[in-house]
Structure formats: structure tokens, C-alpha cells
Swiss-Prot record:
Protein name: NADH-cytochrome b5 reductase 2
Record-linked CDD domains: cyt_b5_reduct_like
Organism: Aspergillus terreus (strain NIH 2624 / FGSC A1156)
EC number: 1.6.2.2
Keyword field contains Transferase: no
């Protein structure tokens, strides 16, 4: 069990005001005194009002509002090559002060229509912070015969893509679970990172997080810098285990595929209360670990390694 981290909060300073009484000269009107006191009181009132107004941040406009909003067209402003088959794409908002409107955990639906063909739709989870104004970032791996990933990787800066959302996945609440486990493969890390970052960003949330992340090679590990930063900042609450199918000679992490033995070692036991296991990755990972989803709204039967280890359907969520 990880030790819980204690947070201390600074108490806001309270301002105190002294009251002064002044005796008016005899035989003269008290009106100037009342006027002075009244104006002083008004000044204090305005100061307090303006201070409170300044301290309360204005709610930012949301780009995606769901419902019948329809598609939102965004311009691609930056492209960053992460490795041989993965890029980070930054799409900017028309309103540079607006935020995406996504919550945790949720995704966006993307759409493009090839010339003479049918529209292609694919969901993606942004890796940028939900409170980040002005833009959103997608991390996308290109797959052979993957029409949306191939389209994204062929895009140039200033081209545009249609988005719709948010698509709610799992309604997270602070301290909803005592311990969560994230089992990911490849770009399946994106919703896991969204969730982990949100947990550690909230000082009220004391949830412990274990990540098991499988990839082919070391260069395929996405968001490694961000994950290491979380682990270094919250060593008592966040543990990451990396597994490589084709590791270098000096690799000290897991080798091969995410195995039953590894999960039995690093995950909390099924009998522990208030735990949740999240799974996201390619079809082969779902098949081996938890079984595939039937549809976005149907989690399907729990099978695979997690079933063999004794976890229940209610303890597992498939992104």
C-alpha cells in the first residue's frame, strides 16, 4: 500500500479595519462628518467588492458543449514528431481564451471525408490539460490501412479537421476509488494519462495509481517524460511499470507482453475494497487482459487475465 501524501493549505489573510470616532466642533453642522464617514464606508465597500470580484476567476467559454452543437472546425497549428510512427498534433481554437469543455474522462470524435468516399469517424482523447485555453493536443500513432490516422499524419499546418464532443467515458469523482490501476498499450496511454494527471492536479484527491504500460520498443513509450514527472512528484501514490516486447540489452523493466504474473504482483488483490482497473489499447491487449468491448456503450463480458485473477466485472472498465 502506498502512503498517503499530506497537503497543507495556506489560510487566507484577513484584513481588519479600525474604526475612528471624531467629535465635530460645537455649533457647526454634522453633515460634513456624516458625508466623510459615508464616503469612507462606501470606499471600503467598493474595495471589498472589487477584491472579491478580482479573486473570482471568470468562467471561460467552452469550445465543445455536446448535445446538438454539431461539428467544430479547428485549424492545425503545430506538428511534433514523437517517434517513427507517432506525432503530436496541436489544433487551435478560434477563441484563444476558450477551453475545450472536456471533463475527465472524456474524448472527442474526429471526422474527415475523403474525396468520393464516406466520412471517416474516429474518437481520440486529447493529452492537453482540460483547463488549457486556446488549443488541444492529440497524440496519434499511424496504423497501416487506418484511414483517420493516415489522414492526420498526411496533414500540414493550417489545414483543418472537424471535431465533436465531448464523448463521456467514465465519470470521475475525487476519491471515488482508493486505488486505481491503468493497463495500457501503445496510444491507449492517452485516456490513462488524462485521468492520472487530473487526479494528481487535485490536492483533495488522494487516490493511488498503478500504471502498467506495454509497448514494442523503448522509443514507442509515449508521454514518458510526463509520466516520470508524476512518479517523481508523487512517489508514494504513483507507480509505473513498463513492458517491452523488443527491449534493448540494458533494459531493466518487463520483457515480452503484459503477463499474468506481472499483474498478480503489481495490482491490488481482487478482495481489496474500492479498487478499479482501467484497460485501453489495441485489440490484442483487450483480448488478453480483459476481453473486448461489444460497443462504446456495452463493456462486454470480462474475460482474459483479469478474469483468471479473480477480478469482477464491476472492478474493470474498458476505455
Amino acid at each position: 500500500m502506498f502512503a498517503r501524501q499530506t497537503f497543507r493549505y495556506a489560510q487566507p489573510l484577513k484584513q481588519s479595519f479600525r474604526k475612528y470616532s471624531t467629535e465635530a466642533p460645537k455649533g457647526k453642522s454634522l453633515a460634513p462628518v456624516y458625508l466623510t464617514v459615508g464616503l469612507a464606508g462606501l470606499g471600503v465597500g467598493l474595495y471589498r467588492y472589487n477584491s472579491a470580484t478580482a479573486e473570482a476567476p471568470a468562467e471561460r467559454a467552452k469550445v465543445f458543449t455536446g448535445g446538438d452543437q454539431g461539428w467544430v472546425d479547428l485549424k492545425l497549428s503545430e506538428i511534433e514528431v514523437l517517434n517513427h510512427n507517432t506525432k503530436r498534433f496541436r489544433f487551435e481554437f478560434e477563441d484563444k481564451e476558450a477551453v475545450s469543455g472536456l471533463n475527465v474522462a472524456s474524448a472527442l470524435l474526429t471526422k474527415f471525408k475523403p474525396e468520393g468516399g464516406k466520412a471517416v469517424l474516429r474518437p481520440y482523447t486529447p493529452v492537453s490539460d482540460e483547463s488549457q485555453p486556446g488549443f488541444l493536443d492529440l497524440v496519434v500513432k499511424v496504423y497501416p490501412n487506418g484511414p483517420m490516422s493516415e489522414h492526420l499524419h498526411s496533414m500540414n499546418v493550417d489545414q483543418r479537421l472537424e471535431f465533436k464532443g465531448p464523448l463521456p467515458k467514465y465519470p470521475w469523482e475525487a476519491n471515488k476509488h482508493q486505488h486505481i490501476c491503468l493497463i495500457a498499450g501503445g496510444t491507449g496511454i492517452t485516456p490513462m494519462y488524462q485521468l492520472a494527471r487530473h487526479i494528481f492536479k487535485n490536492p483533495e484527491d488522494k487516490t493511488k495509481v498503478t500504471l502498467v504500460y506495454g509497448n514494442v520498443s523503448e522509443q514507442d513509450i509515449l508521454l514518458k517524460k510526463e509520466l516520470e514527472e508524476l512518479e517523481n512528484t508523487y512517489p508514494q501514490r504513483f507507480k509505473a511499470f513498463y513492458v517491452l516486447d523488443n527491449p534493448p540489452k540494458e533494459w531493466t523493466g518487463g520483457k515480452g507482453y503484459i503477463s499474468k504474473e506481472l499483474l498478480k504482483t503489481v495490482l491490488p488483490e481482487p478482495k481489496e475494497e474500492n479498487i478499479k482497473i482501467f484497460v485501453c489499447g489495441p485489440p490484442g491487449l483487450y483480448k488478453a487482459i480483459s476481453g473486448n468491448k461489444v460497443s462504446p456503450k456495452d463493456q462486454g463480458e470480462l474475460t482474459g487475465i483479469l478474469k483468471e485473477l479473480g477480478y469482477s466485472q464491476e472492478q474493470v472498465f474498458k476505455f
